[in-house]
Amino acid sequence: MRNHREEIELALAGGAPEIIPLTFYDGLFPPGFDPKPLQEKGMALCCRRGVFNRHTPNVKTTQVNEPGGGLRTIYETPVGTVESLSKKAALAYAPIEHPIKSRDDYRVVKYIVQDMRYEPVYNFYLGEIEKVGMAGKVICGTVYEPLMDIQVTWIGQEQFCYELADNEDAVLELHEAITENHKLLYDVVANSPADYVLYGGNVVPEMLGPDRVRDFIAPCWNAFGERLHEKGKKIGCHLDANNHTILDTVRDSLLDFVEAFTPPPDCTVSVAQARAAWPAKRLWINFPSSAHLEPEEDIRQATLEIVRQAGDRKGFLMGVTEDIPAQHIERSISVIIETLRECPR
């Protein structure tokens, strides 16, 4: 039986396992789906787990279930109250309303983020490593970078674009507060048993602008990266969008690996282009989601082309980081596994 954990760790260290690892987020399996047959064929698990719990000791947080599956979250602070509303979706809750709805809400959210504390749960993480065993790799999931946190958690993507134009000073003041708070998180993660750490992601350069990625996102990668490198740990980012305008920013950053990178036809940068642009980075791709829906021979050819573009395969891994329609999972993953087995190093 293959030791998937060792194979993944070898690839993340820059080596080339005999067979390119294929991982699947363990949280993406639909209800009732049994992954064991695919694991027996050669699929590994990628298990993102935390090494801390977050809490805000001076903020009263109340959640109220609303008709129609809505979940309202109310944050009460000494400087005011904000609310958000989300609704149950396929695998999580989708945001309907975000906490920041007016300029006055910024000071409330600033209080919340400054009050955030991070409680280590190292024994939980060690237990997850033991539980997964050699079936895959447990990596440390953390939080969004400050600017992405503002966009995704506190404002919402569309309104965020307006806020950058109308209230940029308030956005940047909140960014500074979150950045300062994250230094507490850096220490908790750096002192944890995790060896590979994911920080941030879902960056859409067309929305943020490549200059903001360079000026606000990358410095946070680097600050966290410096702290992790002091402890011999590696940092990666979930960069699953169109990366063609930030190739140089990623190259010049302290990121050790890029995770969830998605090649064409879904996104704009090919595996070959990424390997050429980031020779010092490990590349852990997301197999293009649209390709899972294609006929089996097309899936096979797509796999072969990705392997060809990966070159010497050192520091290269495949993964599934997006949900696949349940009826296509076993068929598509089986083809990819079989194809990877046919083209060993």
Where are these regions (language model features)?
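Active-site loop segments of alpha/beta catalytic cores
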Residues: 1-29, 111-345
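Segments that shape or occlude catalytic/ligand-binding pockets
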Residues: 20, 27-63
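Short active-site-adjacent helix-start/loop capping segments
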Residues: 30-33, 80-84, 150
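Surface-exposed flexible segments
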Residues: 35-43, 83-94, 331-332
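Short, surface-exposed amphipathic charged segments that create phosphate/polyanion-binding patches used
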Residues: 36-40, 62-64, 156, 298-303
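A contiguous, low-structure linker/loop signature
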Residues: 63-115, 135
